[in-house]
Amino acid sequence: MSFDSNLEELYQKFCKLKSILEDPSQLSVDSFVAASKEYSELLPVISVIDQYNSLQKDIADLEELINNPETDHELKSLAKEEFYERQKQLPKIKNKLKLSLIPKDRDDARNAILEIRAGTGGEEAALFVTDLYRMYTKYAEQKNWKFEQINSSSTGIGGHKEVSLCISGSNVFARLKFESGVHRVQRVPETEASGRLHTSAATVAVLPEIEEVDLKIDEKDLRIDVYRSSGPGGQSVNTTDSAVRITHIPSGIVVIQQDEKSQHKNKNKALKVLRARLYNLEKQKRDSEISQMRKSQIGSGDRSERIRTYNFPQSRITDHRINLTLYRLEDIMKEGNLDEFIDALIAEDEANKLKNLHI
């Protein structure tokens, strides 16, 4: 199907939706909501199609004027100038149109649950988790996003085996989703007398936060265990059974929450994480090209699987997916200035989606 045929088909679909919505009495509530949503999503695309069609018509009219033997010389000269000017605008509006046709990720507007776990590298990996946590919270502050720590497991000397947080604000998931994967760090540990460079890793998973109304979990599918929370080294830090472990029996997903002193708060936080993981699992099943299985998304923590490398001696960060290297490690890690990486990853994603449009 040609580019213009695709646009015509889309326009016809829009007109049909408009006609349906003008007589809502024929629709059920659910059908009306679905049609309204689709209509709203098409509106900005139709606006660009109108611009494109108007430009095409102008070009055709000018061409007809130029080729008309009755057109006087002066008018023909002006028409040619206008014709070439409009022709130059065509690729730009066509590209704008293609970008508007890229399928939108409906999760982009959602808040995100960010999980960071230590991979290979022992204590160095745990310290790197803390570094990444600081980097992302600084980035959230820059964007005026709110964040709340959901769970953490510290090593007692500044590192974390894992830490998770919920980040809320405008387009959080859209900007953070490409952070999922294995992050590798290369640096000389403070305790390393010989000055030998160590390589360790941490895994990052970014999941869209799912509201309870969006995903219902059947209580009978859950096994909920409560116990006393523990701190570093396993010692008990609470005299009541406030820690919660929820197992989703059909999927085998287990969520542990013990940061709060209240069992009720821990349960609510654990359910929030469980909803996000279950939604992510379903999303992966629906479209394996957009999202791989969770284990594939975050990797095993092996040093060989990495999306980004942080080299401290060279003050260098390299994103291996887009071959982008920046020599601003401290600025990025301590101040959270991640936009250059994130903007480049979004642009790369859009370019890849454009290739797959086949128009």
UniProtKB/Swiss-Prot annotation:
Keyword set, alphabetical order: Cytoplasm, Methylation, Protein biosynthesis
Gene: prfA
Protein's cellular compartments: Cytoplasm
Name by which UniProt lists this protein: Peptide chain release factor 1
InterPro entries assigned: PCRF, Pep_chain_release_fac_I, Pep_chain_release_fac_I_sf, Prokaryotic/Mito_RF, RF-1
Role: Peptide chain release factor 1 directs the termination of translation in response to the peptide chain termination codons UAG and UAA.
GO MF, one example: translation release factor activity, codon specific
S-S bonds: none
Modified residues (N5-methylglutamine): Q235
